[in-house]
Amino acid sequence: MDVPFYFRRNAEPGEPTPIGGFYTQEDIKEMVSYAADRQIEIIPEIDMPAHSNAALAAYPQLVCPVVNCYIGVVPGLGGSNSGVIYCAGKDTVFTFLQDVLDEVMAIFPSRYIHLGGDEAQKGYWKKCPLCQERMKKEHLANEEDLQGYFMKRMSDYVRSKGREVIGWDELTNSSFLPEGVIIQGWRGFGAAALKAAEKGHQFIMTPARIMYLIRYQGPQWFEPQTYFGNNTLKDVYDYEPVQADWKPEYASLLMGVQASMWTEFCNKPEDVDYLVFPRLAALAEVAWTQPAHKDWTSFLKGLDAYNEHLTAKGIVYARSMYNIQHTVTPNDGILEVELECIRPDMEIHYTTDGSEPTATSPLYERKVPVKETLTLKSATFAQGRQMGKTLILPVRWNLATAKPVLGINPAEKLLTNGIRGSLKYSDFEWCSWADNDSVSFTIDLLKPEMLNTLTLGCITNNGMAIHKPASVKVEVSDDNSNFREAAMQSFTPEEIFREGNFIENLPLKLGGTQGRYVRVSAKGPGVCPASHVRSGQASRIFFDEVMLE
């Protein structure tokens, strides 16, 4: 895809269908042979009943008869088609999938065939007369058991061909599991797979929080755009799949670990290499090193040589391990800047006058206090040579900066830390709320101030259903009890649900009112509309800074 995830739209009737390319059977045979020569076995995954938009766009007769929407393909989450899956009530669906699997098994000699089984929304199955009739005929209690039937039927077919089956941990949602199926645990740090282990099934750990390589692998200010928060090289290295509270028999059923790289979040092959390397080396350490023998410092020394090998091979890899993660926290009227690097063998040097840091600049040894507008720059060094990118932190002071925020959300302290967020909503500079319908926080200015304008920094990321609020209200008080409204602004759905990824300021005129306490209340925009790439899902609000003048 040449369109970033946050710009992707739902497919509409009449639009030209994008052709993303395909592999011939000869291409696949060549790849299988190439991998086998290097002692690698390629395991194909044919997703069912969900994550199947491409097949269903080509063969719409395989969906439930109650589906009345246009079936298009939006890579990733499926857009408005995310709930369109194979119909479990049509025998033609199973015949089609058996034919597909016959072709797949003919060109992939792997011992295992992966059948997917994850993230299947059952809304259409609940309405479909064919699916409901299937449930009655097979004496199935609910739609989860209908998926269990679906997966068992296809699993039995694969096993009849002498292969073994792998499936995602949603298969454990059913009251029964296909015989011999191997479960991949991705939800709840992989814990969902333990439900299968309880029944004696083997499993593979691939927890999304640790082993999904689409996450940022370093301080996000330096990283190309991806999704879902941080997952650093050290996060991967520190992961231990065998947990102390496991039953003894679980460990013997654990087959190994897997890192997952979902390429629909990438725009070119180099993006994939960048996200995979060098975290792949950390994954290998997790798989083959006993916990007592793991040593982060020793691993880094070996990794330096490994990275030289990648360079010689022309492989684009991330040097994120050398970059600095910052934390700026209000504390008693000042800001404290904390700088960290995951490599303990790096020195951090910094400046506060806007100049570029060098190996002779002040050495970072403790939190740096900031009391005014300035630009702090820092970088990592080893043996006098700069190793990472320069972190540039523009601190901008206003009446709210370093003032306490009176609320129940710990992240609200970010709203007065003088630092603006980036286009990455998970960069640790954006504040979000669990309940977007009733966002409210109060800033204590510590003394009465004349207030002319309050500006809220707000981010839109259409692909992640992040939008500005439906309304914002500002109230002012002298005693934190009796508040008077100072400003109110509302936005239309057209203004709210815009496409793209961008930051905007929401200014509210306060007209010179005076007060010590400033309360900001925001109402969430609600559910994403039908035309949205995440239609039907709840939208979210993210603010980075409150600026009071």
Where does each model-flagged region fall?
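Short, compositionally stereotyped local motifs that mark structural "simplifiers"
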Residues: 290, 294, 300-440, 459, ...
